[in-house]
């Protein structure tokens, strides 16, 4: 059972607002790399914010987390993410291929995918891997502000939590 700082209803409302914003921007999915975005939408709390991990969210709210094996248990204990996929962290690994495999499985080939570009874990080298994997597979655009903008407006549950 996961320990969540906020109720599942609160998290579901956040994801619903994110999906509405995605629809308004013409996005079929987003690739979220910021730890704070993952926490905001799912409760996922990890110290691995500087390492490659990606929360994929389709416009219908479907979620998949692509992360290292070291973070699998953390995802289970701190989030409501139903589908956690592991990329193997070894020399020459390219987790962007794992992300694109999920996108393909989810029917997102040729679709519009937003990417949260301004994130600690998305270094220049890692962005090159992601961009090269996405190019020719789908259209992509910067969606850095998508979740960040939602986080600015606090819900009653958030206000109560900080009191």
Task: Describe each region flagged by the PLM.
Residues 1-62:
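Terminal domain-start leader segments
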Residues 4-6, 86, 117, 146:
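Short, contiguous strand/loop micro-motifs
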Residues 28, 82, 111:
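Conserved acidic residues
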Residues 46-48, 81-82, 129-132:
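Short, solvent-exposed amphipathic alpha-helical segments in soluble enzyme
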Residues 60, 64-98:
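Compact, glycine/acidic-enriched structural inserts
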Residues 93-163:
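Flexible, acidic/His-enriched mid-domain "rim/lid" segments that flank
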């Amino acid at each position: 059972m996961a320990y969540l700082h906020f109720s599942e209803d609160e998290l579901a409302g956040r994801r619903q607002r994110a999906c509405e914003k995605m629809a308004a921007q013409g996005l079929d999915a987003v690739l979220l790399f910021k730890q704070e975005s993952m926490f905001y939408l799912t409760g996922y709390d990890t110290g691995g914010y500087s390492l490659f991990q990606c929360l994929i969210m389709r416009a219908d709210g479907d979620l998949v987390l692509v992360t290292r094996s070291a973070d699998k248990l953390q995802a289970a204990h701190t989030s409501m993410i139903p589908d956690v996929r592991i990329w193997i962290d070894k020399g020459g690994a390219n987790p962007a291929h794992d992300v694109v495999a999920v996108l393909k499985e989810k029917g997102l080939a040729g679709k519009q995918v937003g990417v949260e570009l301004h994130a600690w874990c998305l270094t220049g080298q890692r962005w090159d891997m992601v961009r090269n994997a996405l190019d020719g597979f789908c259209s992509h655009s910067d969606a850095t502000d998508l979740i960040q903008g939602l986080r600015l407006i606090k819900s009653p549950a958030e206000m109560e939590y900080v009191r």
